């Protein structure tokens, strides 16, 4: 966010950590050392190969290493022994999990990357290892932002100071999977594998969608990674990760707030329902994120100011950022056509409209309608998505996924007249790459200038 400071000698090591933690989102500006290329590759592999059902604990090893080499605890430029100790701890962790990681591409990439870094820093394989980082928790009763928290760490206060009110927008992902974009476009998508939902100067979100059953093209979100970037005197960089059957109430380093800075409590995790519902509030950017586990799968919803959505360094690079651009045309499913073709046909599925070559045991159409009506009496797109999901997956939990997705819209959407959507959006050729109308092309140059003049948007 700011210009280069006096710690220029430590830049490459800081960049190593930042790139390693968020390389799949394209963070950082490139590195001068060949070893740095290992981190984006490793991070991409970690996010691209779901580990929800794997006993391999390489993600835990990565989290411990990132924690040991990030934030205020990062080794300084002249602390090569400390960095080597962290690498030895990392290597030890990989050896302990080696037996369960045979054939795991992410694991083998990590092992080779560690060897490369140890060679580059002249680290001995024998020597002390780093101690686990202990996070300093806020004092008892410190449930609010600290009184000495900088004003910059409270979005709305910062806006009011400039006589402005933030314009909030919403994005959500749920079910098989259904996407509601920042511009209230509603799409049903295939998007199997890892896809970025959000990518801007402050926040990165990526989801991994996996088949509901082997052989089925019906997918659902099995993994979610959220990265809050280091922000001035407010928060350290924090990573949150949820997977099937694991919805933690803490960041990967075990903390529940933004770190050790004065504004640390402007980023907080709150567990609403154990193992089912987590809320993350980032006051310094005016953002609220809701993550749920419904049945086996995850749902995501966010409320964020448009100014944060538009805070990007390179607008043209925001290609497959789903919350902004929507799903690519070749990944979209016309579930309304499927709904129309299925109505009155019972459990019979039309191959031309079905997204799955082979389907699990599903509900009859009338039963699916009745179950969705119980939770979603208004026949909007959430209701139609519910029916679609029951017909394609046979999993009644998808009824609750649609219900909670709508409940999150009611809580997070700033325009109460747009809670219910009735017409699904399928992009026409040429429109799929259109972004938010928040930054029209004639005004894009002015927006970039404003971003340069005012580095703090909330």
From Swiss-Prot:
Disulfide bonds join 153-234, 171-323. It is a lipid-anchor; GPI-anchor. One of its GO terms (biological process) is BMP signaling pathway. The keyword Magnesium does not apply. The record marks 176-177 as: Cleavage. A lipid is attached at residue 433 (GPI-anchor amidated alanine). Residues 121-149 are annotated as: Disordered. InterPro entries: RGM, RGM_C, RGM_N. The keyword Transmembrane does not apply. Residues 1-53 form the signal peptide. Residues 121-133 have a biased composition (Polar residues). Residues 54-176, 434-458 form a propeptide. Keywords: Autocatalytic cleavage, Cell membrane, Disulfide bond, Glycoprotein, GPI-anchor, Lipoprotein, Membrane, Signal. One of its GO terms (molecular function) is coreceptor activity. Autocatalytically cleaved at low pH; the two chains remain linked via two disulfide bonds. One of its GO terms (cellular component) is side of membrane. It holds the Pfam family RGM_C. Glycans are attached at residues 122, 167, 397. It is found in: Cell membrane. Belongs to the repulsive guidance molecule (RGM) family. Member of the repulsive guidance molecule (RGM) family that performs several functions in the developing and adult nervous system. Regulates cephalic neural tube closure, inhibits neurite outgrowth and cortical neuron branching, and the formation of mature synapses. Binding to its receptor NEO1/neogenin induces activation of RHOA-ROCK1/Rho-kinase signaling pathway through UNC5B-ARHGEF12/LARG-PTK2/FAK1 cascade, leading to collapse of the neuronal growth cone and neurite outgrowth inhibition. Interacts with NEO1, BMP2 and BMP4. This is Repulsive guidance molecule A. The gene is RGMA.
């Amino acid at each position: 966010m700011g210009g280069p400071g006096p710690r220029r000698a430590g830049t490459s090591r800081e960049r190593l950590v930042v790139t390693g933690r968020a390389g799949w989102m394209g963070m950082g500006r490139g590195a001068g050392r060949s070893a740095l290329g290992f981190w984006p590759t490793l991070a991409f592999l970690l996010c691209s190969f779901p580990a929800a059902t794997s006993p391999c604990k390489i993600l835990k090893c990565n989290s411990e290493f990132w924690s040991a080499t990030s934030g205020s605890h990062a080794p300084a430029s002249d602390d090569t022994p400390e960095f080597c100790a962290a690498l030895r701890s990392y290597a030890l962790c990989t050896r302990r999990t080696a037996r369960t990681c045979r054939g795991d591409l992410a694991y083998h990439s990590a092992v080779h990357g560690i060897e490369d870094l140890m060679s580059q820093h002249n680290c001995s394989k024998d020597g002390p290892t780093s101690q686990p980082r202990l996070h300093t928790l806020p004092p008892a009763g410190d449930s609010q932002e600290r009184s000495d928290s900088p004003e910059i760490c409270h979005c709305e206060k910062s806006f009011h100071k400039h006589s402005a009110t933030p314009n909030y927008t919403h994005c959500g992902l749920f079910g098989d999977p259904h996407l509601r974009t920042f511009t209230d476009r509603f799409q049903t998508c295939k998007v199997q594998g890892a896809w970025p939902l959000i990518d801007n100067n402050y926040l990165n979100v990526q989801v991994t969608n996996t088949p509901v059953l082997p052989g089925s093209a019906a997918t659902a979100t099995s993994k979610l990674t959220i990265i809050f970037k280091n922000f001035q005197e407010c928060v350290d960089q924090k990573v949150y990760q949820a997977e099937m059957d694991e919805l933690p109430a803490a960041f990967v380093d075990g903390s529940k707030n933004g770190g050790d800075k004065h504004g640390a409590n402007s980023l907080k995790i709150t567990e609403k329902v154990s193992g089912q519902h987590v809320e993350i509030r980032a006051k310094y950017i005016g953002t609220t994120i809701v993550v749920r586990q419904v049945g086996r799968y995850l749902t995501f919803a966010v409320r964020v100011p448009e100014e944060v959505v538009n805070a990007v360094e390179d607008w043209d690079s925001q290609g497959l950022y789903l919350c902004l651009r929507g799903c690519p045309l070749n990944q979209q499913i016309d579930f309304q056509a499927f709904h129309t073709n299925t109505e009155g046909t019972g459990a019979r599925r039309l191959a031309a409209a079905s997204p799955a070559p082979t389907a699990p045991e599903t509900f009859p159409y009338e039963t699916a309608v009745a179950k969705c009506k119980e939770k979603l009496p208004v026949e909007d797109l959430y209701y139609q998505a519910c029916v679609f999901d029951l017909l394609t997956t046979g999993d009644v939990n998808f009824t609750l996924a649609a219900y909670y997705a709508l409940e999150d819209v009611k809580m997070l959407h700033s325009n109460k007249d747009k809670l219910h959507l009735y017409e699904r959006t399928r992009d026409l050729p040429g429109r799929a790459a259109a972004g938010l109308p928040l930054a029209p092309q004639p005004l894009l140059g002015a927006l970039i200038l404003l971003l340069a003049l005012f580095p703090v948007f909330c």
